[in-house]
Amino acid sequence: MKKIYIDGMSCDHCTAHVREALEALDGVGRVLEVSLSGKYALIEGSASDDALTAVIEEEGYDVIRIE
């Protein structure tokens, strides 16, 4: 499981865009949660940190860190 801290999400549409982008990425098994208030996404899978960062940044958001 990975927790991705994301800056720039400001509404439910933002969280939906992040969820859709992550779900489309090879190596992401499931998106467990995308939290607007917590500014993070929680995923299961084997996608690399670089791939996760790239797909989120392509949507216009910044990855702060991945745990």
Regions found by a protein language model. Give the residues of each.
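Residues at or immediately flanking beta-strands
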Residues: 3, 31-33
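Short, thiol/selenol-centered motifs that function as redox-active sites or metal-ligating centers
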Residues: 9-18
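Short glycine-/aliphatic-rich beta-strand segments at the starts of folded cytosolic domains
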Residues: 1-9
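A generic secondary-structure micro-motif detector
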Residues: 8, 41-42
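C-terminal structural segments of small proteins and small subunits
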Residues: 20-24, 28-30, 42-67
